[in-house]
Amino acid sequence: MTLKNRYKESIRPKLLKDLGLKNIHQVPKVVKVNVNRGLGEAASNSKSLEASLNEMATITGQKALVTRAKKAIAGFKIREGMPIGCTVTLRGDRMYSFLERFINLALPRIRDFRGVNPKSFDGRGNYTVGVKEQLIFPEISFDKIDSIRGMDITIVTSARSDQEGKALLQELGMPFSKN
């Protein structure tokens, strides 16, 4: 059973009861997933940007968008409009597919993994987790990468509070640490 079907058939009714909501449309749901990677070396090395775009497309199944500098910062040696990273916004079926692979395949492959930090909510029910290396995703092989790069994964929910967001992600299978 896919994560989307599991959400509709078992998770949503359970959350409706657990959170004491009256309407099924009040139940929090995952709106979108943002996968973001900042590349400091992209200003001087265009190959790293290309490799990063390909990796993001392989991991998410969707073409990555190049993010550009909004203004020049001399200390970082960047000018306005220079490529400084890439991002992918996932919605719908691709989002659920990515979440399922991230929770069930990628997270358990992290070395010394004891769960994700339960304090990484933003106050409005959205959750962000940083990944230190792209090798945790089974789609990326060690032989094909030029360097190890991390990324930020933000799960945007329709939850009104951190407690609702955490309840939703726990039901989806997110392994929170106990501390």
Curated annotation (Swiss-Prot):
Record-level GO BP terms: translation
Keyword Ribosomal protein: yes
Gene Ontology terms: cellular component: ribonucleoprotein complex; ribosome
InterPro entries the record matches: Ribosomal_uL5 (IPR002132), Ribosomal_uL5_bac-type (IPR020930), Ribosomal_uL5_C (IPR031309), Ribosomal_uL5_CS (IPR020929), Ribosomal_uL5_dom_sf (IPR022803), Ribosomal_uL5_N (IPR031310)
Superkingdom of this protein's organism: Bacteria
Keyword annotations of the record: Ribonucleoprotein, Ribosomal protein, RNA-binding, rRNA-binding, tRNA-binding
Gene3D superfamilies, per the entry: 3.30.1440.10
Family matches, as PROSITE patterns: RIBOSOMAL_L5
Pfam families for this protein: Ribosomal_L5, Ribosomal_L5_C
One GO molecular-function entry: rRNA binding
Main function: This is one of the proteins that bind and probably mediate the attachment of the 5S RNA into the large ribosomal subunit, where it forms part of the central protuberance. In the 70S ribosome it contacts protein S13 of the 30S subunit (bridge B1b), connecting the 2 subunits; this bridge is implicated in subunit movement. Contacts the P site tRNA; the 5S rRNA and some of its associated proteins might help stabilize positioning of ribosome-bound tRNAs.
PANTHER family noted in UniProt: 60S RIBOSOMAL PROTEIN L11-RELATED
Recorded family membership: Belongs to the universal ribosomal protein uL5 family.
Quaternary structure (record): Part of the 50S ribosomal subunit; part of the 5S rRNA/L5/L18/L25 subcomplex. Contacts the 5S rRNA and the P site tRNA. Forms a bridge to the 30S subunit in the 70S ribosome.
Designated name of the protein: Large ribosomal subunit protein uL5
Taxonomic path: Bacteria, Bacillati, Cyanobacteriota, Cyanophyceae, Synechococcales
